[in-house]
Amino acid sequence: MSEEHSNDHIEDVVLCSQNCDETNSPKNEKDEKDFKNFSSESSDSYYKNKFRLKKNSIEIKKKSLLKSKLKNDDIQTIIKNDPILSKLNKTMTTDDEIFDLANKKENKTKFKLEKEKEKNEKKEKKEKKVTNDSTNNKNKNNSVPFLNENQENKNQHNHNNKIKYELNEQTYDINNISEEILKKENHHTNIEYNEKVQDQDNTLNINQKVNKIQLNSTKKQKQKEKTKKEIKLNEQNEIKKNNQNFNSSILNEIKKNKELSPLSLIKKHGRLINNIEEIYNSNCEQIQNVRDEFAELKNDLNKIMNLINIGQKAVASLK
């Protein structure tokens, strides 16, 4: 019995192991497949993340470049619109250089220093010239005064003897001038004076004409502007009137459509019915009185007809 029991136990263990192997084998296959899929997914995700990072970095670089370009464009437009900056840009830039706002102060200071240096050099040169002239004049004045005085007297005497008179681009000595020459000179001066006066008159006339023309032109321009303004105002008023008429016509059409709509018609009928009921309720007693009077009249007519019939029968019996 014990051997049989042990054998049975061994068989049970073997069967259990086989069943476990059978059940575990598909599980292991599934695990292997999952592991492969996971490994492939992990590798794909790594490369995908790497690609995304590169893409993001490229986009960031593009955005930064666009921002810098836009800033440069804005700076250039500001420089073009500002007259002072545009002049500085023309003077400071060459064919291949670009104007830098950061170097503006340095360039100004350099320009000022150069100007100051030039001024100082000019002052020094002038001072040197003045000193040299003063020394030369002193040397001249230290010469013999007697000779200088004699030379001055001689020059004055010669100048008085050789005074010349110019007329029509010709020179004459005062002592040798005749009356004819003086008449010619007076005639020439009169002609020149008359010409000057005529020129002045002509210029005045021309200026007056120009002023008149300008005034007329200004008046015409003002009149044209007034007419233009009046035309614009008339056009605006016409447009306003047309808009008002159009709006009023649209409102009337909307009202008509509302009146013709089924809801509005139902409301109207309801109102009429309510009015009729109110009238009927208020005049109910009067209607009953009229009916009673009508019934009495009917009875009276019936009686009269009966009497007429009786009279006709009596007349017929007498015949």
From Swiss-Prot:
Residues 16-26 have a biased composition (Polar residues). Possible candidate for an effective malaria vaccine as determined by epitope response in sera. Residues 1-12, 27-36, 112-131 have a biased composition (Basic and acidic residues). Keywords: Coiled coil, Merozoite. Residues 100-134, 166-242, 281-310 form a coiled coil. Residues 1-43, 112-158 are annotated as: Disordered. Residues 132-150 have a biased composition (Low complexity). Disulfide bonds: none annotated. The keyword Protein transport does not apply. It comes from the Eukaryota. This is Coiled-coil domain-containing protein PF3D7_1144200. It comes from Plasmodium falciparum (isolate 3D7).
